[in-house]
Regions:
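Basic, polyanion-binding surface patches
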Residues: 1-180
Length: 180
């Protein structure tokens, strides 16, 4: 993901982040403590989470390097100001979240921000006519790695409905005791 934030030197900036999870209206992101992003997010208490697709991977990599530089300019990215916080919503991304920091914790060389989600912005072509997410078309970048190797993975079109691996059906007439 790309974390957008207010930057005291460059107005707005971004950094790449591979550590996050969300539950309901809360999200946690983890970043290296000794970074420009952490310094600015601690100061301003706000950030955006922007989910890129594989078509902009070169821009994501620029955002993952060059700490303290104008990475939005270096990657030739565009943005709109967020509606409820002072941080950038990256135009090239397929999903964005406006986040307000609720707590910060440091563990070793990492800082974790727990934030409340104030607004969600989803690319219109990912929504059906009722405003529901078209998950099959959601194609984010998945970054994984360790000290040995780091790689990018991508989602494909294969999917299964929740419960399908246990033999559960969405057909209400079929009863399976495993499905509850």
């Amino acid at each position: 993901i790309l974390i957008g934030y207010k930057d005291k030197k460059w107005k707005y900036n971004v950094t790449a982040c591979s550590s996050s999870y969300s539950l309901g209206d809360m999200i946690t992101v983890g970043l290296t403590t000794d970074s420009n992003a952490v310094d600015n997010i601690k100061e301003y208490g706000e950030f955006t989470v922007n989910v890129p697709c594989q078509q902009i991977l070169s821009k994501v990599e620029i955002a993952g390097f060059h700490s303290g530089q104008n990475k939005i300019g270096m990657a030739d990215m565009t943005y709109d100001p967020a509606k409820y916080i002072d941080a950038p919503i990256m135009d090239e991304c397929i999903l964005s979240l406006e986040c307000k920091v609720e707590s910060t914790s440091e563990y070793g060389k990492y800082t974790n921000f727990v934030a409340s989600i104030k607004r969600r912005v989803v690319c219109e072509n990912l929504l059906d006519e009722e405003g529901n997410m078209k998950y099959i078309q959601f194609n984010p970048i998945y970054f994984m790695g360790d000290d040995n190797k780091r790689v990018y993975r991508y989602f494909n079109e294969a999917s299964k409905n929740h419960g399908e691996n246990m033999g559960c059906s969405s057909d209400e007439d079929e009863y399976n005791p495993l499905c509850g």
